[in-house]
Amino acid sequence: MTGRIALLSLTLFSPLSLASTPDGQALDFTHSTIGYAALLIFAIAYTLVMLEEYLQLRKSKPVLLAAGLIWAMIGYVYQQTGSTEVARQALEHNLLEYAELLLFLLVAMTYISAMEERRLFDALKAWMINRGFNFHTLFWITGWLAFFISPIADNLTTALLMCAVVMKVGGENPKFVSLACINIVIAANAGGAFSPFGDITTLMVWQAGHVSFLEFMDLFLPSLANYLVPALVMSLFVPHQTPSSIQEVVELKRGAKRIVVLFLFTILSAIGFHAFFHFPPVIGMMMGLAYLQFFGYFLRKTLARSLAKKTAIAMAKNDEAALKRIGSVVPFDVFRSISHAEWDTLLFFYGVVMCVGGLSLLGYLGLVSEILYTEWNPIWANVLVGLLSSVVDNIPVMFAVLSMQPEMSLGNWLLVTLTAGVGGSLLSIGSAAGVALMGAAHGKYTFLSHLKWTPVILLGYVVSIVLHLLLNHQSFT
């Protein structure tokens, strides 16, 4: 049993993720030199990923190299056994999985980048700053906004936006910054758990067809409880002070609100293709990219006329500041927004997909699946997945589960979606939002400051699981 637990830990603590093999005569290399070498390469690669902040080494680099080495070894051993076609089919299958993920995320990131370029998030930040809220009110406002924005935007962007407000208003109060950042991380992760667009893990579960778009809403109340339980406790310790008033003026660029509407239509297109035609949602997302491209064309073609009107108004009012802003206007370019996508993250996903493809073909994921989902009760296995995601990034953990293809009820698929999404809140290093805020609020929000509240966050984790088991018990049959 000890040996199996060790193998389980080693497997899940490396980026074993998103790959699965098609039907074919895959060979078992779990007890071979090649298999052990693959595990060692994964362990080293993931160690480097975890040390990204300290080494200043982008996380995509080690997993890209690991993927190449693993598949080179697989190619060699399958060539020796005369089964090259099996390995090639597995490789192509995983490349297709990655292509769907890449294009979907690229469109979503492009829209978020376009909203940032049109200053939509800057305007939201300025609105909160100008209201002169006290620390207690700001604690709740940033938390609620993080919870409700992250299902549409990604939780990382949401967390960074809310943290910018906290640092701008209360940066001189370390206690408030620490509590507010913890609250934001919990809220962003919890909010992302009940929407396919809120987190990469929920997106993958949706694309795999295990949970429909509307069925994700069954996780709303458990996710809400996951946020509210620790937030209510922490709010008792927030300083009851009012920071000095700051006035900040932000003018939205032309087309900002219409881009939000186009993004909503893009989401509806993705849902429609998946619901009505059973096509991959990425088809609707790519169609949505065309919406943005044509709108960008419209903005460029009408820019001169728009600037002429604004210039005439500014000259009539003798507004020098407005004239200066008009003179610095840069035409909207959708390809600039595409270039601002998080390419390190997208390449990291490639490494994760191919690494797990190799592990799956070598037989390790089948072995781990046997331990987790056959010998254990799936409910306890899914609770463990959430705890693992507090140490290991939830993306490789969830991709590993998807690659195992366990036979589970809808309730258990919802449970693993919930736990993988919110489990990362237990530690600051457990989610991209937490890691990013440690950098944005350096010295004020730290690993140790988050760790002090882990028992309260764990209480919220347990309450959310129990609430899901009670409210959605019919989906476990």
Curated annotation (Swiss-Prot):
GO molecular function: antiporter activity
Effect of T201A: Lack of activity
Effect of E251A: No change in activity. Shifts the pH optimum to more alkaline pH
Ranges in the topological domain labelled Cytoplasmic: 52-60, 113-132, 172-181, 239-258, 300-344, 404-413, 473-477
InterPro entries linked: Cit_transptr-like_dom, NhaD-like
A cellular component annotation (GO) from this entry: plasma membrane
Membrane topology: Multi-pass membrane protein
Periplasmic side: 1-33, 79-94, 151-154, 207-220, 278-281, 363-378, 439-454
Lineage top rank: taxon: Bacteria
Xref: Pfam families: CitMHS
Consequence of substituting E342A: No change in activity. Shifts the pH optimum to more alkaline pH
Effect on the protein of changing S431A: Lack of activity
Keywords on record: Antiport, Cell inner membrane, Cell membrane, Ion transport, Membrane, Sodium, Sodium transport, Transmembrane, Transmembrane helix, Transport
Effect upon mutating S425A: Lack of activity
GO BP annotation list: sodium ion transport
Localization per Swiss-Prot or TrEMBL: Cell inner membrane
Outcome of swapping T202A: Lack of activity
Cross-referenced NCBIfam families: NhaD_1
Annotated family: Belongs to the NhaD Na(+)/H(+) (TC 2.A.62) antiporter family.
Protein's recorded name: Na(+)/H(+) antiporter NhaD
Primary gene name: nhaD
